[in-house]
């Protein structure tokens, strides 16, 4: 069904995410233990856009946990950090000072490309710190080497776990008092297409933080 105005554009979404434990220190097995209630509602489903991935988000004062679960994929993920547009990848945008009426990214906004496999790193998962168009300034140089990732291949898909330490997010130190973050993501798949969180790329979701979803941090 074609919509003149996408239904999800008619709502101001504020979703709650639970508090989680720190990531596992082990080098095998699950990196993150995601609590009940961490799976996000995907507003894009209201717009008849593709739906093939679950997105789970949780937090604690030391960082942010994100898990992407892709289903219905006919082959293993592929990709390279040298050509993100042609890769299986999840694009994340995070704002540690969401205002709701600011249309240009501030120094509190961050953008990461998270690859389940990177052929230039022995097919291990990888994160690439990305610029945001028209961003006013940055206060912290996020370093991908401090972001922990783990991929679990499954029949017909994969799980990608990402732990972003608060040290890599400007303004995260005060996040407990603020109680919310701005968040947006797009899951890009070479077989299944693109699944945005709310709106397709006809809208400026890649650089306008007022279009991102607010995540309320619960204890």
Where are these predicted regions, by residue range?
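Structural preference for beta-rich elements and adjacent junctions enriched in aromatics
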Residues: 1-219
């Amino acid at each position: 069904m074609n919509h003149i105005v996408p239904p999800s554009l008619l709502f101001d979404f504020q979703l709650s995410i639970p508090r989680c434990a720190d990531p596992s220190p082990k080098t095998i097995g699950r990196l993150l233990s995601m609590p009940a209630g961490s799976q996000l509602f995907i507003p894009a489903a209201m717009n008849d856009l593709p739906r093939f991935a679950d997105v789970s988000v949780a937090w604690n004062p030391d960082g942010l946990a994100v898990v992407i679960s892709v289903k219905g994929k006919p082959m293993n993920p592929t990709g390279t950090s040298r050509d993100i547009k042609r890769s299986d990848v999840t694009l994340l945008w995070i704002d540690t000072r969401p205002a709701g009426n600011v249309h240009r990214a501030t120094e509190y906004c961050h953008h990461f490309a998270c690859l389940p496999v990177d052929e230039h790193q022995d097919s291990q998962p990888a994160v690439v710190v990305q610029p945001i168009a028209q961003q006013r300034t940055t206060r912290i140089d996020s370093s991908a080497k401090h972001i922990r990732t783990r991929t679990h291949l499954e029949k017909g898909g994969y799980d990608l776990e990402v732990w972003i330490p608060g040290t890599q997010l400007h303004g995260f130190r005060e996040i407990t008092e603020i109680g919310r973050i701005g968040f947006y993501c797009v899951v890009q798949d070479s077989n299944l297409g693109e699944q945005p969180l709310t709106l397709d790329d006809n809208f400026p979701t890649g650089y306008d933080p007022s279009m991102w979803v607010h995540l309320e941090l619960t204890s």
